[in-house]
Structure formats: C-alpha cells, structure tokens
Regions:
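Active-site phosphate-binding strand-loop segment of PLP-dependent enzymes
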Residues: 106-164
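Alpha-helical elements of the RecA-like P-loop NTPase motor core of helicases
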Residues: 63, 88-89, 136, 140
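Alpha-helix N-cap/loop-to-helix initiation residues
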Residues: 12, 62, 84, 108, ...
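Conserved PLP-binding active-site segment in aminotransferase class I/II-type PLP enzymes
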Residues: 1-68, 72, 128, 142, ...
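Flexible loop residues that form catalytic
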Residues: 57, 82, 131
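Structural detector of well-ordered beta-strand residues that form the stable sheet scaffold
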Residues: 53, 78, 99, 152-154
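Conserved PLP-anchoring active-site segment centered on the Schiff-base-forming lysine
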Residues: 65-119, 127
C-alpha cells in the first residue's frame, strides 16, 4: 500500500532564497518593512479589501477579534468541534461560553444546519474555519443569518487563504 503523507512540507527554492536574502539584510524582524507593505498592497489590490491588518499568526488575529467584539461572560460563541485549539481558546479567555458545533464527516466542517441549531439569543459570534484549502459553500447564507441576528461572523482562513 502506498503511503499518503498528510501536510508534507513543500520547499520552494525561491521562498528559501527570499528568506535567506531577508535574514542576510539585517533588517528588523518586526514592524512595517518593505515586504509587509508589499503584501498589504497585494491584498488590497487583488481581493478588494478596504483595510488590511496583518498579524504574526491566526492565533493573534483571533485574539484581536475576541477583544474587538467585547465579549462578556454571558455571551456565547460557536466554534467547530474539529479545529486548532485557538479557534476556541482565543475567545475562552474573555470568559464567554464556547459552544462546539458538530462537523460533517465528509468536509470536517460544520454544516449550516448544525450551526443554526447551536444559535441562541446569547450567541454573539460564530467562528468558521475554512479547512485544508476548502471554504464552506454556504458562507453567503451564513452572512445573512448573522446579519439578521446581529451575530459577528469570524472567518478563520489560515488554512485556506484565497480559496472560495
């Protein structure tokens, strides 16, 4: 039986050369360097975003989201039952209740039906994780539900950037 590797690292020579060039340049590893500014411009141009705020990780981005929406201990947030730990822990630190939503066996993501069944009057946010390069196929419907119920929709696309 042939072995199938999960998350086998991909080494692209140009990426290795760019990292090497950057490290040799002795430029700071933080702040708005020229590469960060290039990435921001690329995102603004190619995706039509109004604003771009880059972070060092999806964990940081989710923690910023949890603070930005001002969660209280009486609030609930819905997250997929199968995801990286920070999908929940970034919000748990606010004291809110985390509701884990069942996923579908085929997609490893929650269905719209499963998410809808988790929503209560206390739901303040829903975290959707676009997993392994795949986006959920019901995002527009979910946006409408969230808008009608005044629920924040947070999309974690760390594993599926640019997919649709």
């Amino acid at each position: 039986m042939k072995e199938i590797f999960f998350n086998e690292p991909l080494k692209i020579k140009s990426s290795i050369n760019n990292v090497k060039k950057f490290l040799i340049s002795n430029k700071p590893l933080h702040g708005p360097g020229e590469n960060i500014l290039k990435i921001k411009q690329l995102l603004l141009k190619n995706f039509g975003f109004r604003n771009v705020f880059l972070t060092n990780s999806c964990t940081s981005a989710l923690e910023i989201c949890s603070l930005a929406i001002n969660l209280k201990p009486s609030d609930e947030i819905i997250v997929p039952s199968f995801s990286f730990i920070t999908s929940a822990s970034s919000f748990a630190r606010t004291g809110c209740k985390i509701k884990f939503c069942d996923i579908e066996k085929k997609t490893l993501m929650p269905s719209l039906k499963n998410i809808s069944s988790c929503i209560t009057k206390k739901t303040r946010a829903i975290v959707i994780v676009h997993y392994q390069g795949y986006s959920v196929d019901y995002i527009e419907k979910l946006k409408k539900i969230c808008n009608s119920k005044k629920i924040f929709l947070i999309e974690d696309a760390a594993q599926a950037f640019g997919s649709y």
